[in-house]
Amino acid sequence: MYDWWVLQLAKLSVSRKLMVGFGVLLALLLLVVISSNRTLTHQTALSEQLAEVASLMEQTQQAEQGRLAFEAGSDPRQAEQVRQTLAGMLQRLQALRDSELDPAALAHQVEAIEAYRKAFDDLAAADQQRSAARGVLVGTAQQALDSFARLEELMDASLAQQAGDPQALQRSRAVADLHQQLLMVRYQVRGYVFERSDKAEQAAFAAFDALRQAATTLRGQLPGEADAALEQAMGSLQGYRGGIEQFRAGVIRTRQAQQAMQSSTQDMARAGRTLTEAGRQLRESTASRDRASLWLIAALALAFGCVAGWAINRQIVRPLDEALAQAEAIAAGDLGKRPQNPLTLQRRDELGQLQRVMQRMGDSLRELVGRISDGVSQLASSAEELSAVTEQTRAGVNSQKVETDQVATAMHEMAATVQDVARNAELASQAARQADEEARQGDAVVDQAVTRIERLASEMDVSSEAMARLKNESEQIGSVLDVIKSVAEQTNLLALNAAIEAARAGDAGRGFAVVADEVRGLAQRTQQSTAEIEGLIQRLQQGAGEAAERLENSRSLTASTVELARRAGAALDSITRTVSDIQNMNLQIATAAEQQSTVAEEINRSVLSVRDVAEQSAAASEQTAASSGELARLGTQLQAQVGRFRL
């Protein structure tokens, strides 16, 4: 199963492996950024909600300050401002219902604001009630003052009519006291209106009760018109008391509204603190949860990074190590090196292609080196045979040269004999027989020389073909070296690309960069070895070309020698026939002496030509022997170079 996964991963190219690894890391990084952004947005929203709660608490203080200002001045604009503040608070709370804050605390805050607004409406109504009561107090107080002033005038008139009557004076004083008590009641009521305290209330009602009791005591004791005025004044006092009662009811309602607003203010403060604390706890818990999420994602990213590094090491570095080992083995001359892991050759990525190319290169080099080794062995054998044949040819040519010199000497003697033929016919006949015998020997020597020279030409052709095959094999070696050079350059480029990718990966790709540098160094050494082998092959090709050229020259010279030898054979045949004619026509020797002398001179020149050709053949044989030795030396050197490779 593990090998199957490794093979599936190996089907991906190196670029796709890197893209997948870094893509997942970037995706995790994007997830971290998104999570951080969500956390920041969430925390910002919670902070804004807490700021909204703090603003609500500030608006609560503003509403309380507006209430106090309204209570102090009873300004309707101030009351409207308080109502707008409360309405704005309700709108903000309505907007916060969809938030993550405590719904119960929000509902309690809404209820507290509603209660506060209701209490404030009661406070405003109580203020209006007190204002109306103050108007009633002013009107009824003025009526009471007018009634008591009328009563006092009547009593003063009655006292003037009843001058000296002590009871009338006493009643007049009592009425004056009632007027003073009314002024005191008004004073106490005014103090109660301004203070609205329980003490002022008690003082006002106590003064009013004292006034009413005193007025009740005087009922029926005053004269008829004065008594009616007293009743009217008592009615005014009753209306005045009703105004006081109305004002007191407004004060009580105001106090109740104040207590309700104080309670609502406390409830709003508690709800605000509850919301603030709940929001703070929610923010802390959310921050803790988000931190845990970020740590989890970071741990996943770290774990995947480690797994990706391990996978890259398994999928890239190890195959590169195997390719490095195989390239080192090839550079060391071991062409039988095989990958240790058979799955490496089944990979479809660039590394698998590199392994397969290295494998094919090793196979091709092994086959080529084997063929070169066989060809070099054949070349060495052919060179040895050629050297032996060349030695034989050189010996034959030297013998031919000696024989040709002998023929030339004989022909020279024959020419002298022809000149003396007239004086000594028998000597001429004897000389003719000797010439015939020597001509036959020369003919045999010439035939032998022709045979050996033709054999030499055949061996030259074989040597030329061997040199052509050697040249072709060296050219094939050059093409293979071009392939090796191309593979080394591709390996160098791949190692350079791998080093660049490792540099981009940072610390995670440092080991990969070291391996890539080693691969580049190996590729450079491979290129150097390839250059050395290429230099050897070029020198071998140059030597082979020179040997082929020399063999071609030798072949041409050998062909010329064959032609000249044939001509020499023809000349010897002519000499033989001529000598036979001399023997047959011994009687005509004298008359033909001049002609024979001429013929002898021509034969002498031909023999000299044959000797020159023999000398050229000897020189060509020397050159061929030297070329054969050089060819044998090159074959030995090539065998030594090929022996460096282990098949």
UniProtKB/Swiss-Prot annotation:
SMART domains reported in the protein's UniProt record: HAMP, HBM, MA
Topology in the lipid bilayer: Multi-pass membrane protein
Limits of the HAMP domain: 314-370
Source superkingdom: Bacteria
GO molecular function: transmembrane signaling receptor activity
Induction description: Expression of the gene is not regulated by the presence of alphaKG.
Positions of the HBM domain: 45-287
Residue ranges, Periplasmic side: 38-291
InterPro entries on file: Chemotax_Me-accpt_rcpt, HAMP_dom, HBM, MCPsignal_dom
Gene3D superfamilies, alphabetized: 1.20.1440.210, Methyl-accepting chemotaxis protein
Methyl-accepting transducer domain sequence ranges: 375-611
Cytoplasmic side, ranges: 1-16, 313-647
Any one cellular-component term (Gene Ontology): plasma membrane
Subcellular location: Cell inner membrane
GO terms, biological process: chemotaxis; signal transduction
Inactivation phenotype: Deletion of the gene results in a drop in the chemotactic response toward alphaKG to close to background levels, but does not alter maize root colonization.
Keyword Cell division: no
Keywords: Cell inner membrane, Cell membrane, Chemotaxis, Membrane, Methylation, Transducer, Transmembrane, Transmembrane helix
TM segment ranges: 17-37, 292-312
Keyword Cell inner membrane found: yes
Subunit structure: Ligand free ligand-binding domain (LBD) is present in a monomer-dimer equilibrium. AlphaKG binding stabilizes the homodimer.
Family: Belongs to the methyl-accepting chemotaxis (MCP) protein family.
Role description: Chemotactic-signal transducers respond to changes in the concentration of attractants and repellents in the environment, transduce a signal from the outside to the inside of the cell, and facilitate sensory adaptation through the variation of the level of methylation. McpK is a chemoreceptor that specifically binds and mediates chemotaxis to alpha-ketoglutarate (alphaKG).
Name assigned to this protein: Methyl-accepting chemotaxis protein McpK
Organism listed in the record: Pseudomonas aeruginosa (strain ATCC 15692 / DSM 22644 / CIP 104116 / JCM 14847 / LMG 12228 / 1C / PRS 101 / PAO1)
Phylogenetic classification of the source organism: Bacteria, Pseudomonadati, Pseudomonadota, Gammaproteobacteria, Pseudomonadales
Gene responsible for this protein: mcpK
